[in-house]
Amino acid sequence: MSIFLVKAPAKVNLFLHITGKRIDQHHYLESLFVFVNVYDLLEVNIDGRKRGVYFSNFKISKYNNTVYKAIELLLKHSSVRPNISVNVIKNILVSAGLAGGSADAAAIIRLLGNMWNIDCKLLQDLALKVGSDVPACLESKTLFAKGVGEDILLLPDLLLPRYIILVAPRGKSLSTAKVFNHYKCDNFSASICDKLPVKQDDWMELIYNSKNDLLDVALNFVPEIEEILFVLKKLKNVFIARMTGSGATCFALFHELSHAENAAKHLRMTRPDWVIFNAKIL
């Protein structure tokens, strides 16, 4: 039996624009992804006695989850059929706009794909079958994604403020599918693909002036998001404050570590009803 321990980092959408809808009702998105040092941990046992995916601190089905779906897809393209069991230690908030399930699936795809020498293009195709955020999570680097998550542009030279605090209302969660199903706006955001910035300052201006198109829908289900964003935007030295993904997690981004730490310390003292993480962009 072989045992592997792998990390799955959380993602944050610095902006998220909805630019249209396909006939199958999937939405076209354009989003700037970053990944932060808040991780789920996956203990992967290969050729052991057990099969399935086990979550140490959440009640999630061991067969009906993104990690198990990814394993089943990978096994169809492998010459071996080992027993695989995974114990997932969840640190990323569930149903919170941080792509925890997608990150976990991407982590197992990376591990088994490399182990079984599966082609990188095929891995990306399989990742998209698991979920629209999984191809981006497979990269786990700063990137711009468009379409339904399949079209990715890596941005290795983009220098961003690195220090971030994540804030979510305690005990609240939001289903991604629920939020998208209630997104009824037909006045979609204009695509920015033909005018993506080249210069660093232009990227910073784009990020600052962008938004999350899912915010209004999320507010209908978790109105506490509005107060969180109001407080975050008032923090000293904050660059931007915004909701990530389909919510309900929000973030505040800072240039200096001390500014982020002071802000998080203040929030922990004054808002015990919020879950707060200090993090750094990878």
UniProtKB/Swiss-Prot annotation:
Binding site for ATP: 93-103
Keywords associated with the record: ATP-binding, Isoprene biosynthesis, Kinase, Nucleotide-binding, Transferase
Domain of life: Bacteria
Pathway in which the depicted protein is active: Isoprenoid biosynthesis; isopentenyl diphosphate biosynthesis via DXP pathway; isopentenyl diphosphate from 1-deoxy-D-xylulose 5-phosphate: step 3/6
SUPFAM superfamilies registered for this protein in UniProt: GHMP Kinase, C-terminal domain, Ribosomal protein S5 domain 2-like
Function comment: Catalyzes the phosphorylation of the position 2 hydroxy group of 4-diphosphocytidyl-2C-methyl-D-erythritol.
HAMAP family linked: IspE (MF_00061)
Protein name per UniProt: 4-diphosphocytidyl-2-C-methyl-D-erythritol kinase
Lineage of the species this protein comes from: Bacteria, Pseudomonadati, Pseudomonadota, Alphaproteobacteria, Rickettsiales
